[in-house]
């Protein structure tokens, strides 16, 4: 999506505050296109069956195998999730936030080593999974932790078209076919076909995806309060700091506990430097990730549409207890850094 369109959307969301989902012409075109992708996969399978019926095993069998291997996927659950019995406080918080948003509890919470968090719905039953990046989680205060979980779970109710079953099918199918075709010397000439379809689909969805991100921010603010959501967005500015710490940890004999080191640097960051980081972010016209508006735009929209009384009135969020429950995951991340660093040194 162009910077001009992104800026127009930002001004509309900031000034009008229209956070209700709506079906646009681009969304309808995307839905029709997704149906075409599914129909094309079914036709390919039918063509393979026809070839087999006529006795052409050489071409028929590969066509059917390809149609089966690259059929529409519904996503996969994370390989490892935190057991509820081991992290009851974290799950209780996630369940409370989900209830405030009007959705069911998550099926599981997975931990990553990234400065990020995400939400996924997988399988025919669309089971919900929450992914929490330990580096980001490690620098949050109690209200910011609530805002983070609320924002991610809000992706289940914010009307994002890319999370609908048919759209997910089409995106995964086109991506799989592109990867499969581009790897062969002969088939590579056909790779631009599914790749072009993927680019077109992403272009059709970009506007509503960014609008859905604003809606997720707004829904999260209704749960945790605008102040908490703004503070959380401010913490996202430390992604570059984390990247530098991680690179140093993997190549130098520094602190392998990248979460603690990030927390220390964030806490000791001078106000002047933090303001410089904010100013750089505000000057950015757009981001490479077309599904997310610039952080500065998200902050401005929330400031223009404040929620003074959050829906979730928790007596207290025992963040220390949650972090104690996450201690084994932190230890595993530290060991992963040490293992990678030793491998680099040996090489």
Where are these regions (language model features)?
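Post-HEXXH active-site segment of zinc metalloproteases
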Residues: 158-192, 230-237
